[in-house]
Each structure stands twice: as structure tokens, then as C-alpha cells.
């Protein structure tokens, strides 16, 4: 366990980084729907809509499940994932080009890669959307501290070789994480 300084969070105020998330927080059946008590209009038995396809426009309805716990305003302001020095990136930049939350984040967590910090920010690239950069077996994210990191991957048709995001704050770790989404 480590003491992490306070940084802007994408979480809604009622949710903290120590909150326990239960399956039923995201999954439930629709008693009153045409699918009855064993189904939901949102696959796979989700409470709300959660789009995972590339080129999905950002709006509250498309990511209603994410916005149950995460602040849409904070995400669109790039409070926790800032743009790089060229003005690219950040959550808002990725959402603006139709990258779904699931392109980078896995709500079920990340398989342990055997490296310290391998679960940082639930980053686990969806290899249907994000591909490894030349020479890498998997898309790579390197966390180099608060508000800072880099990606080596192919996303939205562009190769990112060690694409850096702004430096700032205390460096907590500097280990590359190779991600291979086994299943969702």
C-alpha cells in the first residue's frame, strides 16, 4: 500500500478509490423488459448502455454505465489524463475521435503481468481497436507518475512510439506494462 497524494479524480463524490464495486453495480436484469428476469436490453446483462465499438460518438447515453460512477465533466475537462504538449490526447481528445472508454480501460480489471503496478488506471487495451506498435508483442503503456506516462501502440490509424503525456507531480513508478486482453 502506498500513500498517493490527492489528485483530481474522475470518480463521482460518493465513490472513492477504496470503494468496493459489486457485480450488481453494473449488471442486472430488466424485470419489466421483454427479456424478463434473466436478461437486459443492454448486453451482457448491463444496467445501462456501455458502447465498446470504435467510432462511437461521446454522449451521456452511449456511456451511461461509465457515468454512473465516473464524472463526465471531470473526464471531458481532462482532469486526470491531460493532453500532451502538442494539444493531443487526454480523455476528451480520445473521445472526440470516437475512441470508446473500453479501448484503453477494462472495467473488470487487468490480469497481473508480473510487473509492479500492472493494474494502474485499469489500463488494458482492447486489441480489437488498439494494436501493438512495431516490435512489440502487445500495446504498451508506461506509467511514469501522476499525470504522466507514455504509450507505444497503434490507435486510430496512427503509430505512437513512446508517445508521452505531460509530466507533473510525484513519480510513483516507471515500469512498462504489456497488456493483452484475454477476454471481456
Language-model features, listed with the residues they occupy:
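A motif-centric signal for short, conserved binding hotspots located
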Residues: 1-184
